[in-house]
């Protein structure tokens, strides 16, 4: 199969939404029957984002095969059906590490290792490898044109475009077209300078996507086309919208997909966007409202919980409910008490690391349990629910996780020293293992217990969900917890690790060790989130059994 490439770059400022724009174009092309994949090239020196602070970088998105990747891959999976893998995201750090490893082995036969050709060749090889088997590969380069870190990536895609030829490669560039109230007009000069910077690298954009808070007038689009050397019809106006799921229709209406198909000589049926029209309709026509409290430690940057936020919205679509997320700092729960949780229709405690704010999360789980408020715990959110239950129901005074307390008498959560990975290999870890890439990662099989809420929600005896953790339920203390009424409703493939817990005498209390948010999409939702938001809606209407 011959693969065609669209390289996506950004200019003027960061955070323009390259990932959303690229994913939206991918969604349209997929809706035309084409097989599409996406890639994100990150210029930072970290090997992957696994050890980066969520408040700096946002969430770490985990793929099926266990890669810790940029959050943009979450956008990709929410917009297209193709599942991302470790081939779909790589960093400068990963590339340099691979090249240096080869140099140490002597693979380069004594050559002087340089950015050109060794680093650029390594980048090109990864891009070609990741695109195999698809009609179109959309490749997003992180950062902003002009950044010193991104230069090797820019040079690599420039070379690749030359090698592939115009009939197989094109460039899409996102820029900002600001509106100046004092002048009463949009300004195109930043876009002109951004394209000039791109041209200095040797890249001529074929499509310009212009971000603005309003529709860019035709005369300004004509001006941009003239000074940036692109066709007028290839200047796409992307105004701010109240939902990212409207973007596919917005750029489809301007014929962006036709430009791509014409360039590559592809004959494909018109895009069927009926699924996206349904998503937009459901989003615009809720029949009720719910307020979900998210109790976490990284709330100053909502992107730290990006997939959770989106999964809650998706569940709202499926239940025809408008979901408002109220972010609650778990440290505030510690200092101000659980009174700040009053009025919430449901409580969610997401994943996290470190002991800061953990007691606040435990208090949130206790509040939800005692007040019959729907509760969903994810990863650490399951562990704190378990700790709370052990302390206050199973009479295990001082119970804790060994992650936070080494001398607790009841370590109900402990370090996993051994488990079976997704390929059936035994993984072993100790407290001395590196932080990066050493967790239980990726998609794992889970057995669901008969008669459990989890099995009712999923409608299957087994499911596969994605993990990212190194601590688990201590099986030695599990009998005491089960005797006190805790229900284990999900077990790992070898039935040695607890994956889901429930509290039977509670209207809706479910917690999972895995991350269900990574597989939720606007078109399909996710069973756990749908059940959780449905319970929140029933709580509002007074229909939830107490």
From Swiss-Prot:
It comes from the Bacteria. GO terms for molecular function: ATP binding; CTP synthase activity; glutaminase activity; identical protein binding; metal ion binding. Residues 1-266 are annotated as: Amidoligase domain. InterPro entries: Class_I_gatase-like (IPR029062), CTP_synthase (IPR004468), CTP_synthase_N (IPR017456), GATASE (IPR017926), GATase1_CTP_Synthase (IPR033828), P-loop_NTPase (IPR027417). Residues 291-542 form the Glutamine amidotransferase type-1 domain. ATP binds at residues 15-20, 72, 239-241. Pathway: Pyrimidine metabolism; CTP biosynthesis via de novo pathway; CTP from UDP: step 2/2. CTP binds at residues 14, 147-149, 187-192, 223. Its EC number is 6.3.4.2. One of its GO terms (biological process) is pyrimidine nucleobase biosynthetic process. Allosterically activated by GTP, when glutamine is the substrate; GTP has no effect on the reaction when ammonia is the substrate. The allosteric effector GTP functions by stabilizing the protein conformation that binds the tetrahedral intermediate(s) formed during glutamine hydrolysis. Inhibited by the product CTP, via allosteric rather than competitive inhibition. The active site is at residues 379, 515, 517. UTP binds at residues 14, 187-192, 223. Keywords: ATP-binding, Glutamine amidotransferase, Ligase, Magnesium, Metal-binding, Nucleotide-binding, Pyrimidine biosynthesis. L-glutamine binds at residues 352, 380-383, 403, 470. Pfam families: CTP_synth_N (PF06418), GATase (PF00117). It is an enzyme of class 6 (ligase). It catalyses: UTP + L-glutamine + ATP + H2O = CTP + L-glutamate + ADP + phosphate + 2 H(+); L-glutamine + H2O = L-glutamate + NH4(+); UTP + NH4(+) + ATP = CTP + ADP + phosphate + 2 H(+). Homotetramer. CTPSs have evolved a hybrid strategy for distinguishing between UTP and CTP. The overlapping regions of the product feedback inhibitory and substrate sites recognize a common feature in both compounds, the triphosphate moiety. To differentiate isosteric substrate and product pyrimidine rings, an additional pocket far from the expected kinase/ligase catalytic site, specifically recognizes the cytosine and ribose portions of the product inhibitor. HAMAP family: PyrG (MF_01227). Belongs to the CTP synthase family. This is CTP synthase. The lineage of its organism: Bacteria, Pseudomonadati, Pseudomonadota, Gammaproteobacteria, Vibrionales. The gene is pyrG.
